[in-house]
Amino acid sequence: MTPIEKTTDEILRLAAEHFKVPREQLSAGDDFFKKLGINSLQALDLLTRIEQHFHIELPDYELQGVSDFRTLAERIQSRL
C-alpha cells in the first residue's frame, strides 16, 4: 500500500466514523459532499478532525476545489 493509499484509507475511516456510515460505502474517488450529503460546515468539521488526526493544518487555499477523498489525501500527504 502506497503512502497516498494509506492516507486515503485513514481519511475514509475517519469520515465513516464521523458521519456514522459503513466504511464500505465510501471510496477514494467519491465526492464527499454528494456521497455523504453534507454541507460546507459539516465538511469543515470533518476537515478539523482530519487535521487533528494527522497533526497538520491545511491552509484554505490548498482546499479550494477539493471535494473527493483522494485529492484530500494528496494534499494531506504533501504536508506529512
Functional labels for PLM-detected ranges:
Residues 42:
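Two-component histidine kinase catalytic core, primarily the HATPase_c
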